[in-house]
């Protein structure tokens, strides 16, 4: 998801990556600010945490956009670890909204293998792409399951839009990992797009909006 796209043959649906990054960053910042204003003093309905998650998402994508301009430890290691924390925060926000107990140690656990694997495979693009895509894909499905588990008692149709976005993002991530593992890889830069890279950032943008 958040590493250079290796599928250069899949160019029929490739958008401009810097534009998509800017889109995700701007939307995350604006929605985070809006939620912060709306939340006010409320701290227990998940919205305050959701605002923080959106801010972290903006920071993570800003670091990705700075690939080649800042040290790799920031644009690769920190960025991908923050993205794992974004999914963790999303899961916890859903649990908090549903009135379920906090499970921070559990939901943050995937950030540990992300940090370890990205550092180990810092110079191995293909392995890093597979590892990050699999872990983030599993986290996306986890967030989807958290919403699904209480769908019958949650009021509103917004949950279905969120589930659709999370399901699509998880699918794109896991398909990308599968293709990276099975196809020859030619390393290109993060700012060069391919079809799956485009779909990944588009689904990220959709989840932010939902």
Where are these regions (language model features)?
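Juxtamembrane segments at transmembrane-helix boundaries
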Residues: 30-47, 61-198, 205
């Amino acid at each position: 998801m958040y590493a250079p796209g290796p599928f250069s043959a899949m160019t029929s649906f490739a958008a401009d990556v810097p534009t998509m990054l800017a889109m995700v960053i701007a939307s995350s910042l604006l929605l985070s600010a809006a939620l912060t204003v709306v939340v006010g003093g409320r701290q227990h309905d998940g919205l305050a945490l959701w605002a923080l998650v959106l801010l972290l998402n903006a920071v993570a994508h800003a670091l990705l956009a700075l690939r080649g301009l800042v040290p790799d430890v920031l644009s690769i290691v920190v960025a991908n670890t923050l993205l794992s924390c974004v999914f963790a925060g999303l899961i916890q926000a859903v649990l908090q909204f549903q009135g379920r107990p906090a499970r921070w140690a559990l939901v943050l656990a995937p950030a540990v293998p992300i940090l370890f694997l990205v550092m180990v495979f810092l110079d191995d693009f293909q392995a890093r792409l597979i590892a990050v895509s699999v872990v983030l894909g599993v986290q996306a499905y986890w967030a989807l399951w958290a919403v699904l588990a209480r769908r019958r008692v949650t009021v509103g149709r917004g949950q279905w839009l969120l589930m659709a976005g999370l399901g699509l993002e998880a699918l794109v991530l896991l398909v990308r990992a599968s293709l990276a593992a099975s196809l020859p890889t030619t390393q290109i830069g993060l700012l060069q797009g391919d079809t799956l890279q485009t779909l990944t950032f588009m689904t990220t943008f959709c989840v932010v909006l939902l």
